[in-house]
Amino acid sequence: MSGCLQILTVLLCCRFWALVFSQDQSCCVHHAADIPRCRDACEQLASIRSESRLRHLLHRLPSYCPETLSELWICINNSLPGASRKSDGWVGLGCCELAISAECRRDCKQASSKNDISKVCKKDTENPLYSCITKNEMGSVCCSYAGRHTTCREYCQAIFRTDSSPTVSQISAVKEYCQSVSPPLILCVENYTRLHPTHRPIDSLHCCDRAEEAHCQLACKRILRTLSTEQEIMDGLISECGSQPLPQDPLWQCFLGSAHPPANTDPESPPIAKMDSAKLHCCFKANTSICRNMCVEISTSWGTQSWQEFDQHCEYNPVEMDLITCLADVREPCQLGCKELSYCTNFNNRPTELFRSCNVQSDQGALNDFKLWSNGSIRMPLMNIPVLDIRRCRPEMWKTVACALQIKPCYSRSRGSVICRSDCVEILRQCGDRRRFAEAQTPERICDLLSPTDDPERCIPLNRYLTASELESSVEEVIHPCNPNPCPSSHLCHVNRKGCHVGHDCLPYYCVPGCKLGEASEFLVPADARLQVPVHSAQPGCYEVCVCGQSGRLENCAEMPCFDTSKSCQIAGQRRSHGSSFRVDCNPCSCFAGDAVCSSRQCVRSDSSEEDRRLFTGLPCGCADHFVPVCAGNGRTYPSACVARCVGFTDSQFVFGSCRSFDPCSPNPCQRNQRCVPRRQVCLTDLSEFPCPQYECVSRPSSCDQKLLDPVCDTDNMEHANLCVLNLRGKTLAYSGHCQDACRRPREVCAHNGESYSTVCEAFSERVAVDYQGRCHAVGLESEFGSDSGCNAVPCPPLASDACQPVTPPGACCPVCAGMLRILWNKAQMNIFAKLNRDQPVSLHDILKILRLHVSVPQCDIFGYLSINSEIIILIAPVDQQPTPLQIEACSKEAEKIDSLINSGSPTLVSHVPLSAFLSSELQLSSVRSSSCVSISVCVLLLLCSLILTLTSDL
């Protein structure tokens, strides 16, 4: 533990390292010589001058240099002036040993305030720690009134120094020595003692009934009646009951709960009702009225009712899977990657799998669960399951169960955390103590209630985690900069895709301030985001749109028109409820408040003749696959006038030619003192209500923030820190991002949206992927049944990797290695969002900008376009020119994650405007052939060499 403490001290004080340790490599030479990887990493750190890069690599140093190298860490620690300069006066320092998890304990000892531990020390699992800190904080306030009167201060501090409630003699002593010194101190102490009345041991007698063994229950009651101090009582219970105080043990849970200060029941000052809009989103997914009503009550009036009752009635109710999964998304969103667990080691090194809770706390929780179950009983909200000694009966299987329920792997169609039924039945048949089973209780009946499915996409298959991952290498083909979250508790972590200032190093992530989705919510959204949240009345179908303000609160809320969720859709004689998805022929559809919203794909009828199938183009209205492009008023290029008319545009709403072939600033529509700048966009709202301008008028700025990094490249291939600087210098934008040598000269490409771009950089800048080299000249495939004659003359580029089975996007000619989503959306909702945003149209760029934040792996990026059938097509593809199979798999998993969030209506995604208008999604993935690399060790070796060369060139 001391080694970990030294490591943490180093990480907290990395800015001092640059001043001192960089001049002295003796720590590396003398104490890391036997571990080459550690010595190399240590020496690299010693030579770095960039503080940002130093900080990033320092955070990774423990993965190269284990904490067992205590002399190394002591040496490093001693090289840091100020390493021990934490605030010794922090009142919580004396509480740190009460922390349950080792990581929380370490952070607590290095903290300067409660804010420093909020990310690692969770209030729901570290109750004793936070109760102690709260008590010490109150003591610090009260005793500060003593001023320089040391005797008064000492008697005051004695009241707050122990876990016990203050005794009568302690209170009398404070009054005697402090009454004349400071009446405010007396008043403060009286307020504290009124909130924390003296707790008698016999007040906790009811907790004894929570013990599982009869002899423990009797001993508990005897101890509480005969012993007085809390230490004596705790020692006696540990001795008599034979178990340590684990937080999952119902007996100890009860004692901890009894120690908490009672709620303020003063009728004159009722608690302020706090709202959790994120959880309230989920309440409308409940299938039973009792769970819906309980969910609404605890989401709109936080603190008026415990979640325990809700958990008992709803948490393990199979019919409430949608509700429970939604709440799990809000509490613990699924994230890619898992590593650095010390107990659940088989879950490590899984960079392309999704987990809800891969962290030190859950790792410790799994260990505690296993210890608790070793007592012979598994306590669940609905039942107790008697088991044999699991330390002898399938211990590895039980360890995997404990880890799976704590680490919580996520799967595509259900992100709930239940093990598969067959695993449940197997382990209870072998290790269930049938002599103690309740009447009519069998392994099958237990598992029908707790693990009702064997669908591998809806449950956790234990065999996957009974052995270690095959990816044992630490080489970072796929990294997760934001997992675990490195940012403060009030900030969100975003992947850094902007890069660094020229000549500087930077971290692979950046932190942005956020807002909670309600006073009681833990769910954060980024500043300036527009959110759709339920109204306070919690009436189904009634929402308001708010903005996350700079104050950290939701502001400027405007109510949306309510929609009737009780209305159903009548389709082909069948009734479809609001929010349900279905198909009509080949078209995906969704019912929204009584209206069926469907895509407009062209379908081949089952009774079509061979001639009809031969002539079928897959284009709207059976249009010919001739490429004579027209530019519609929504900013989208369509392959022909026939297609544009068929999808709803009049002849006055389109012109012949592709949209990028026109200069929106000619003639100049701006005022004399303004400059016209092209700003091409594809709008998703009605043109009759919300015009879709392709330019903006900007005034030449007088000055710009050079430190604000959002790089852009001009037509002279000169890079500027941001668009403001480019406009200040009077340059013309070529594309966003750093200038690339590969795009220095024009080389036309055709993108998936049917537009031709001068360079691939221009296409990527508009977040659209490339179909083939050269100017667009063909109508791509719109249907698997359609003719591909238009693509016959197109030379497709080679696939990025021979290892992938590619997908072909709608309207494209060439396949790509990517995960693809085809999203159905509600135009009426888009129009409402535009109306509430000062009549600003909603664009495809707005969609892509938000979705991009949900892609957590830097090796993958998002691209998208509007198909001619008005579906939003999203591609999540590797950014490397020659991606590894693991990177392709990671991109597919990112697409799978977003697809699942859309189809489940998870508030983690659809609370963001305009993503709230999403109805459903169809997923296609690029599968990966495992034979792409002859040997994992060879692949790892090649990648390691590449990494070393890259690091060497950077340094």
From Swiss-Prot:
Disulfide-bonded cysteines: 621-646, 623-642, 631-659, 704-724, 713-739
Keywords: Cell membrane, Disulfide bond, Glycoprotein, GPI-anchor, Lipoprotein, Membrane, Protease inhibitor, Repeat, Serine protease inhibitor, Signal, Wnt signaling pathway
Sequence ranges of the Knot repeats: 28-75, 95-132, 142-188, 207-254, 282-326
Topological category with respect to the lipid bilayer: Lipid-anchor; GPI-anchor
Signal peptide from the UniProt entry: 1-22
Residues bearing a lipid moiety (GPI-anchor amidated serine): 931
GO BP annotations, alphabetical order: blood vessel maturation; canonical Wnt signaling pathway; dorsal root ganglion development; extracellular matrix organization; negative regulation of metalloendopeptidase activity; regulation of angiogenesis; regulation of canonical Wnt signaling pathway; regulation of cell cycle
Tissues expressing the protein: Expressed in the cerebral endothelium.
GO cellular component: plasma membrane; side of membrane; Wnt signalosome
Annotated region (5 X Knot repeats), positions in chain: 28-326
Positions of the pro-segment in this chain: 932-955
Pfam families in the record: CC4_RECK (PF23332), EGF1_RECK (PF25027), EGF2_RECK (PF22955), FnI_RECK (PF25028), FZ_RECK (PF23298), Kazal_2 (PF07648), RECK-like_N (PF22961)
Residues the record marks as site: Reactive bond: 625-626, 706-707
Subcellular location: Cell membrane
Residues with glycosylation annotation: 77, 191, 287, 375
GO molecular function: coreceptor activity; endopeptidase inhibitor activity; metalloendopeptidase inhibitor activity; serine-type endopeptidase inhibitor activity
Effect of residue 254 to Y: In no food for thought mutant (nft); lethality caused by the absence of most of the intracerebral central arteries. Defects are caused by impaired Wnt signaling
Domain Kazal-like: 615-661, 686-741, 742-778
Record note on domains: The Kazal-like domains mediate the serine protease inhibitor activity.
Subunit text: Interacts (via knot repeats) with wnt7a (via disordered linker region); the interaction is direct. Interacts (via knot repeats) with wnt7b (via disordered linker region); the interaction is direct. Interacts with adgra2; the interaction is direct.
Similarity-based family: Belongs to the RECK family.
General function of this protein: Functions together with adgra2 to enable brain endothelial cells to selectively respond to Wnt7 signals (wnt7a or wnt7b). Plays a key role in Wnt7-specific responses: required for central nervous system (CNS) angiogenesis and blood-brain barrier regulation. Acts as a Wnt7-specific coactivator of canonical Wnt signaling by decoding Wnt ligands: acts by interacting specifically with the disordered linker region of Wnt7, thereby conferring ligand selectivity for Wnt7. Adgra2 is then required to deliver reck-bound Wnt7 to frizzled by assembling a higher-order RECK-ADGRA2-Fzd-LRP5-LRP6 complex.
PANTHER family: REVERSION-INDUCING CYSTEINE-RICH PROTEIN WITH KAZAL MOTIFS, SERINE PROTEASE INHIBITOR
Protein name: Reversion-inducing cysteine-rich protein with Kazal motifs
Organism whose genome encodes this protein: Danio rerio
